[in-house]
């Protein structure tokens, strides 16, 4: 049973790209903690919605998150192809406390150029949202409510002084678990 209210992280001001990178590193640590093996359960699905105007830094945040999670290659914007998939190596401890690497799928969606709400489904991405891994979705509002509920809504806005305001709202229990990890930092 899920509860009706979930946690938020109070608005945080990002004054530079370095601040965005620092936030991404903090988030990566919590994601890695969340995906650690517990009773051989790696079947977690983590879904983030990124909300904000053009040029606010949604792709920049995603790029820093991917790099903080260990991706070393180029991070392309998925604007024209709807989705860029990545395979991340996540270190984990098994039942004997041995360190092993697990491949974690990461799908970066940009729905800005969609012609209609269910285009992401017609493109064959429905199953991606139920498979273990991470889905990061820019412009989720273009899907007009057809996407699964995001664990986190990450809102970015441009302040008058050109800094960014970052606000995080959890919508699920797993989203709350991530926020509790941030509060423990």
Where are these regions (language model features)?
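Switch I (G2) and immediately adjacent beta-strands of P-loop GTPase domains
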Residues: 81-115
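Short phosphate-coordinating micro-motif centered on Lys-Gly-acidic
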Residues: 1-5, 10, 118-185
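Short beta-strand-centered segment that lines the nucleotide-binding/catalytic pocket of NTP-utilizing
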Residues: 43, 71-86
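Phosphate-binding P-loop
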Residues: 30-45
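The conserved Walker
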Residues: 54
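N-terminal pre-Walker A segment at the start of P-loop NTPase domains
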Residues: 2-34
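Hydrophobic anchor at the beta1->P-loop junction of P-loop NTPases
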Residues: 48-50
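Conserved lysine of the Walker
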Residues: 58
């Amino acid at each position: 049973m899920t509860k009706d209210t979930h946690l938020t992280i109070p608005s945080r001001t990002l004054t530079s790209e370095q601040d965005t990178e620092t936030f991404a590193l903090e988030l990566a640590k919590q994601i890695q903690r969340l995906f650690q093996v517990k009773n051989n359960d790696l079947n977690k699905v983590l879904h983030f919605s990124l909300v904000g105007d053009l040029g606010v830094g949604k792709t920049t945040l995603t790029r820093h998150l991917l790099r903080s999670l260990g991706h070393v290659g180029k991070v392309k914007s998925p604007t024209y192809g709807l989705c860029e998939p990545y395979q991340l190596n996540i270190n984990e401890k098994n039942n004997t406390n041995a360190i092993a690497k697990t491949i974690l799928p990461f799908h970066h969606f940009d729905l800005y150029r969609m012609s209609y709400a269910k285009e992401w489904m017609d493109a064959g991405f429905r199953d991606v949202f139920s498979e273990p891994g991470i889905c990061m979705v820019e412009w989720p509002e273009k899907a007009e409510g057809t996407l699964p509920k995001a664990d986190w809504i990450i809102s970015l806005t441009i302040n008058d002084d050109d800094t960014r305001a970052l606000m995080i709202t959890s919508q699920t229990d797993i989203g709350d678990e991530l926020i509790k990890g941030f509060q423990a930092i």
